[in-house]
A protein has these predicted regions:
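Surface-exposed loop/turn motifs at beta-strand-loop junctions within extracellular Ig-like
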Residues: 109, 582-586, 679, 719-721
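Bacterial N-terminal signal peptides
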Residues: 7-17
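Short, compositionally stereotyped local motifs that mark structural "simplifiers"
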Residues: 496-618, 623-664, 668-670, 676, ...
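Acidic, contiguous N-terminal accessory segments
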Residues: 11, 20-147, 375-378, 382, ...
């Protein structure tokens, strides 16, 4: 069979000639790229597909090139783009051959052809007019077969069109797995025909604390991208405003087909036995007490049958071999007092509540196996006695041993740790580098066989605080591009991967500009939250993207497109509070920082002579408090010594510490202090709170400056990890006037 699609590249196509050296901006980086001679014109093309299995790919390519294509015979001087399979190639491997007048995309399977199309798309520019692509040959394949992204549609709902636009972005960068989180406490989003109440009553909700938080932050920051999307709201039969939505099974099948056309498989997640408050609100008999609960009653045969009935319909909609059952963060307290759960334990010889969850997970595993599906669950299921056909998804970054334990048992693992692959977390240029430096198979202690059990990597985007498509794009991009690079490339030199990516990033941001994607701009650099100066100061921030604009205000208002642009150094002659914002080329705002400039007032050195090197570290029991002031309330475990503000190796639990001692400033000068922590921290100098990074939060860096006279200054740092899940604390001091100078610590 031959299908030929003539495509006229009109206004949707991009207007500049792409030369051979520009092929070097392709992300992910190809394994091999050989430059040819000349160019291939793409004003008019035909797509030649002789394999019926590739017809969806041909349609996808035609849509990518023009957005409008009709089936007809070739003619004139059209460039032929041929799609073909070659079984000698590996899964997802492809070759892209470009010569004058014709382009060949050959894949080891459908996924390989889709990856070749993605590479061709990146060779196309982004404005109307005649286009050419360089003649070349690319031979390419991924390192990891699983290159995924999680989308949470329960906390905030995403329309079919929004999901498809996200799939388009994934396809551009060769991500091939969408993990679709469809059910949670906040909303049931998938039509289950056997239980119509689940969407009839469970798809909409009144505003919850997350919605209110989004609204408050949007008002505070004057950022409409943070507001709850009004298109997802309605007035219910009681006259109340509610939020939500759901997908019909027909819509879901349409999205599945759309994804598969682009080489993407969708793994559905219906989360049991925890995260089930919406299900038990609609069907109270599912819980232990017959009332709304986040946990199902696993002692009830009816509950287990309910789960299987739901999965029957899920499996019928989603053909992918992997189905996610959740299994995380289960509140088991109800099971302790539930007669049915206690009876289940007696009948099955289960000794503990933890064992009861293991029994439930194994029941679902047997069910999935009978259906020809692989069970996937969060890393809490790693020790539930599952077979090697089930997959563990590592998410708890502090639970570092789970990958080794699961792979020793012969289970496959998907790596999506909180440490770098939670895309709902705050981001900066450092988070990009953390993704690029992370290589799951390089986990310490894994044998070669264990390494091969790691399926790949996935970025998780939980949407409690993400309520609009614009904000979703901001949280995901460009981190998703970094994930695509790391999951594809076999280059084991981390620093080379980082440097190469940052060279390519500006070209990728230009592509996102053309697609009207609200990505996060690179960090605003060259400014501190607090800056001291003598005589006069200079404000001169920078951003690593030439098409971005920095604007500022000095009256406390949020900068707009009409605010003054920073095109050079801004002289500061009096105490001033700056608000600086970065703007994309389309005028939309990305990020804001504040910078307070003040005349330096030197802190005198103390008349002390400390004798012992390092800082005294008071290690306390973690009280569960959420402020640094709670640290001292915990019992003292030990007194230790650290050479600087860093956690001593002995501290591997109860991350609740106070550093005390003295800092020696080697010269009069302005010193910049930086405190990076997860969770709360504070830094005091001579009894004055210099940095306040307090409260529960993910990794945040705070900076401040102090003018110090030469000599000793009292220093105190407080730090706690709210969840006691690993401890993240980094602290630095540098002399602004002479960075070569080093401070020392004694007590």
């Amino acid at each position: 069979m031959t299908m030929r699609l003539p495509v006229l590249l009109l206004a949707a196509v991009l207007c500049l000639v792409v030369h051979a050296h520009e092929a070097a901006t392709i992300v992910p980086t190809p394994v091999q790229l050989i430059e040819g001679t000349g160019t291939c014109k793409l004003d008019t093309v035909t797509v030649d597909c002789r394999d019926a299995a590739l017809l969806p790919a041909a349609q996808y390519l035609a849509q990518s090139l023009a957005g409008r294509a009709t089936v007809a015979a070739t003619g004139g001087r059209a460039t032929s783009v041929k799609l073909a399979l070659d079984t000698t190639l590996e899964a997802s491997q492809y070759r892209l051959d470009i010569a004058p007048g014709h382009i060949d995309i050959t894949g080891g399977d459908y996924s390989g052809v889709a990856c070749g199309i993605a590479t061709l798309r990146q060779l196309l520019p982004a404005a109307s007019g005649s286009i050419e692509v360089p003649c070349l040959r690319i031979t390419d394949k991924p390192r990891y077969g699983w290159r995924g992204l999680l989308l949470d549609s329960s906390r905030h709902f995403w329309s079919v069109d929004e999901v498809k636009r996200l799939l388009d972005l994934m396809a551009c960068y060769k991500l091939n797995r969408l993990h679709w989180h469809l059910v949670d406490d906040e909303g049931w989003r998938i039509e289950i025909k056997r239980y119509p109440q689940l969407t009839g009553q469970g798809a909409f909700r009144p505003f919850d604390s997350h919605d209110l938080g989004c609204e408050e932050r949007a008002a505070r920051e004057h950022n409409a991208d943070l507001r709850v999307d009004r298109a997802k709201m309605k007035v219910d039969e009681h006259g109340d405003s509610v939020y939500g939505g759901y997908y019909t099974q027909r819509q879901l099948r349409d999205v599945v087909a759309y994804a598969r056309e682009r080489g993407i498989e969708i793994m559905p997640e219906v989360d049991f036995p925890g995260h089930s408050r919406m299900a038990t609100t609609v069907l109270p008999w599912l819980s232990c007490q017959g009332e709304p609960s986040s946990t199902l009653c696993v002692g009830s045969d009816a509950t287990l049958q309910f789960c299987k009935n739901v999965y029957d319909e899920v499996i019928d909609i989603f053909p992918f071999a992997y189905v996610h059952m959740g299994g995380d963060e289960v509140d088991k307290r109800n099971w302790q007092s539930c007669p049915r759960c206690r009876q289940r334990m007696r009948q099955c010889g289960i000794a503990s509540i933890e064992g009861l969850q293991g029994w439930f997970v194994r029941q679902l595993e047997a069910y999935f196996n009978a259906k020809g599906r692989h069970l996937v669950g969060w890393d809490e299921i790693a020790d539930d006695g599952l077979g090697t056909g089930s997959v563990v998804q590592w998410w708890r970054g502090w639970n570092k041993g789970v990958v080794e334990r699961a792979t020793v048992q012969g289970k496959q693992v998907i790596c999506s740790p909180t440490t770098c692959l939670y895309f709902d977390y705050g981001q900066d240029d450092g988070t990009i580098d953390e993704i690029l430096r992370y290589d799951p198979r390089s986990t310490a202690g894994l044998s070669a066989g264990q390494q091969q059990l790691i399926l790949g990597m996935q970025g998780n985007t939980w949407c409690e605080w993400i309520a609009t498509e614009a904000r979703l794009q901001y949280q995901v991009m460009p981190r998703m591009i970094a994930l695509a690079e790391r999951a594809w490339t076999s280059d084991t030199c981390r620093e080379r991967v980082v440097a190469r990516f940052h060279e390519k990033l500006p070209a990728q941001l230009e592509r996102l500009d053309a697609l009207h994607v609200r990505y996060k701009l690179p960090d605003i650099t060259g400014v501190s939250e607090h800056t001291l100066y003598t005589g006069h100061g200079v404000l001169w921030p920078a951003i690593a993207y030439g098409k971005a604009t920095l604007r500022y205000t000095t009256d406390g208002t949020v900068p707009t497109c009409q605010s003054p642009a920073i095109t050079g150094p801004v002289e500061v002659t009096r105490d001033t509070h700056f608000t600086i914002a970065s703007f994309r080329p389309d005028g939309s705002r990305s990020d804001m920082v504040t910078a307070t400039y003040a005349q330096a007032r030197y802190m005198p050195a103390l008349d002390v002579t400390p004798k012992t090197d390092g800082l005294l570290v008071e290690w306390h029991r973690n009280t569960g408090g959420d402020h640094c002031s709670d640290i001292a309330q915990g019992a003292l475990i030990a007194r230790l010594v650290s050479p600087a503000v860093q956690l001593p190796p002995a501290i591997d639990h109860d991350y609740s510490v106070i550093f005390k001692g003295y800092l020696y400033a080697p010269a009069d000068g302005i010193y910049e202090f930086a405190l990076d922590s997860d969770d709360g921290s504070q830094w005091l100098i001579d009894g004055t709170l210099l940095i306040d990074n307090d409260g529960p939060h993910s990794t945040i860096v705070r900076r401040n400056q102090a003018a110090l006279r030469q000599g000793w200054h009292a220093t105190e740092v407080h730090y706690f990890d709210y969840n006691d899940n690993g401890g993240t604390l980094h602290a630095t001091v540098r002399c602004v006037d002479n960075p070569a100078l080093q401070v020392t610590y004694k007590h």
